[in-house]
Amino acid sequence: EVYGKVTPADLKGKVVLVSLFATWCGPCQKELAEVEKTLYPSYKGNMDFRLLVIGREHTDADLKKYNERKKFTFPLYPDPKREVFSLFADQSIPRAYLFDKEGKLVYSASGYSPEEFQQLLKAIEKALK
């Protein structure tokens, strides 16, 4: 796998952002560009935060090829059979789910807009306090 496996133990006690996307989704591309530009640089060194960007219907090979073009510095995780996606939704991307350190869902969004992304950043800050 491109970035290894993530286990529940890896996430315990951390603020976790699950971002679901597809390589062919226009709004997803805008959101991921913003993740690369603002969100990831701000939080990549924070040991209390985990970012899980999950490619719906994509394999490791798909994501490697995609990231050769995009050059994202954050990890991309495959979900070729929609196993993770199906835990959250049955359609519509991008989707973002933010969980606090206790594992409680504290923010969710479907679709992308700059305003919504700012709300997400505020929710992350609040969850990390």
Which positions does each model-derived feature cover?
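Thiol-/selenol-based redox modules, centered on thioredoxin-like
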Residues: 98-129
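Solvent-exposed loop/turn segments at secondary-structure junctions
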Residues: 22-27, 57-61, 82-84, 113
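Conserved redox-active cysteine motifs that mediate thiol-disulfide chemistry
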Residues: 20-37
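Extracytoplasmic/secreted envelope proteins and their assembly/folding machinery
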Residues: 8, 32, 36, 40, ...
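A short beta-strand-turn-helix
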Residues: 1-16
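Short pre-active-site segment immediately N-terminal to redox-active cysteine/selenocysteine motifs
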Residues: 14-16, 21-24, 92
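A conserved nucleotide-sugar
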Residues: 46-51
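Short, internal strand/loop/helix patches
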Residues: 52, 64-102
